[in-house]
Amino acid sequence: RTFSQKMVPSRRLSKLCLSCHDGTVAVDSFGGRTGTTLLTGGDSVGTALNNDHPIGFTYNTALATADGSLHDPNTKTVTIGSGAQTKTGTIAATMLYSGKLECSSCHDVHNTFTAGSGGLLKVSDTGSAICLACHNK
């Protein structure tokens, strides 16, 4: 299943995100404002996000077929953004980077194609829509 994929931020763009948002600092800091969540404790770099969605893995037809509960990223169409700022295309074209799932697959840090539901999500989290964009449940 998808959650058995290892978290391997293989691209610079996810490494850039994780340089601040590693689960220990800047948990809810974005959009030019300081977050309110403060964490204390020992160093947990590399483990803090292990219970979150994996990143840095190849999401392709072979994975979708083997998993059985994922949409084929080359045929499933999704719409990211909201209002006048939307883009429609396959999962591969709108959410993946060189065929890999990265932080920016779901989060739009430049706020160009956000769904307006918080967390800078490209697809609304209402009714688990962001999850159902890829997961066939």
Give residue spans per PLM region:
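C-type cytochrome heme-c attachment and multiheme electron-transfer modules
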Residues: 1-137
